[in-house]
Amino acid sequence: MNRLQQRQPFLENLLVGVNSTFHQMQKLSINTCCQNLQKILDLLILHRTIHSPAFRLDRMQLRQMQMLACLWIHQRNHDHLATLDTIKWISP
């Protein structure tokens, strides 16, 4: 199996995890969703350091994930101060 074929399931699982966190927003508080999202990002960083290059996400991809999360939160949260606090919490 080549690197692209190995990487595809990893990226698909990542998207499923992030998507499920986003959809929990109706049931959970924004802080709980952000904590779950941060766990996913932490796991990505861990994978980036211990797995073969086929499974590594580069810094730009991790930053894109954070940016998408922040945009998603901004679109769904009408309290701008809470949104800014959340974005600061997610983004290192």
Swiss-Prot record:
Question: Can you supply one Gene Ontology CC term for this chain's record?
Answer: host cell mitochondrion
Q: What is its main location?
A: host cell
Read off the InterPro entries from this record.
Rotavirus_NSP6
UniProt keyword list: Host cytoplasm, Host mitochondrion
Which Pfam families does the annotation name?
Answer: Rota_NS6
Q: Where in the cell is it found?
A: Host cytoplasm; Host mitochondrion
Protein transport among the record's keywords?
A: no
- Subunit record text: Interacts with NSP2 and NSP5.
Instruction: Spell out the family assignment given in the record's similarity comment.
Output: Belongs to the rotavirus A NSP6 family.
Q: Would you tell me the protein name for this molecule?
A: Non-structural protein 6
The organism encoding this protein is Rotavirus A (strain RVA/Human/Indonesia/B37/XXXX/G8P[X])
